[in-house]
């Protein structure tokens, strides 16, 4: 699976500088991270709806779209697939592959990365309340 995502990532990088009039990927890069995030969220919702409805074939199709849009967002943010695999390995080493790390105050070892200085800090969203839009 990681090979497929790596190939997709490389294809996304190659397509980002193509003509936005003919390349969906280039168009997403032209529109920026907000549009990329919106497309990613839309695909995630479609996967959830299809899963709840029991439409396995649609879940597969929409999951492929979700992974494509996630890969585009990764490329825009300077995240490489191997960065994600390294984090998954770190989590597996700590808790096992089937566990999600808690968001609590648990101190976790930092992963060394040559690009750490270029990344924006992660901001915790816990404790925030959702506002209704009118």
From Swiss-Prot:
Which transformation does this protein catalyse, written as a reaction?
A: 1-(5-phospho-beta-D-ribosyl)-ATP + H2O = 1-(5-phospho-beta-D-ribosyl)-5'-AMP + diphosphate + H(+)
Annotated Pfam families = PRA-PH
Q: Any idea which UniProt keywords this protein has?
A: Amino-acid biosynthesis, ATP-binding, Cytoplasm, Histidine biosynthesis, Hydrolase, Nucleotide-binding
Query: Which pathway does it serve?
Result: Amino-acid biosynthesis; L-histidine biosynthesis; L-histidine from 5-phospho-alpha-D-ribose 1-diphosphate: step 2/9
Residue runs in coiled coils:
none
* SS bond list: none
Localisation: Cytoplasm
User: What are its E.C. numbers?
Assistant: 3.6.1.31
Keyword hit for rRNA processing: no
| Gene Ontology terms: biological process | L-histidine biosynthetic process
InterPro entries to which the protein is assigned, alphabetical: HisE (IPR008179), PRib-ATP_PPHydrolase-like (IPR021130)
GO molecular function ontology, one term from the record: ATP binding
Q: Name one GO cellular component term.
A: cytoplasm
Q: Chief localization class?
A: cytoplasm
Similarity remark:
Belongs to the PRA-PH family.
Can you name this protein? Phosphoribosyl-ATP pyrophosphatase 2
> What gene is behind this protein?
hisE2
């Amino acid at each position: 699976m990681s090979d497929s995502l790596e190939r997709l990532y490389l294809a996304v990088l190659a397509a980002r500088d193509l003509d936005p009039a003919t390349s969906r990927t280039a168009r997403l890069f032209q529109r920026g991270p907000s549009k990329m995030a919106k497309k990613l969220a839309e695909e995630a919702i479609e996967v959830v709806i299809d899963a709840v409805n029991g439409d396995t074939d649609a879940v597969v199709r929409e999951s492929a779209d979700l992974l494509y849009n996630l890969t585009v967002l990764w490329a825009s943010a300077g995240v490489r697939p191997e960065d994600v695999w390294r984090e998954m390995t770190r989590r597996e080493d700590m808790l096992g592959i089937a566990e999600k790390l808690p968001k609590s105050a648990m101190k976790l070892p930092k992963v060394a990365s040559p690009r750490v200085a270029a990344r924006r800090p992660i901001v915790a969203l816990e404790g925030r309340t959702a506002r209704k839009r009118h």
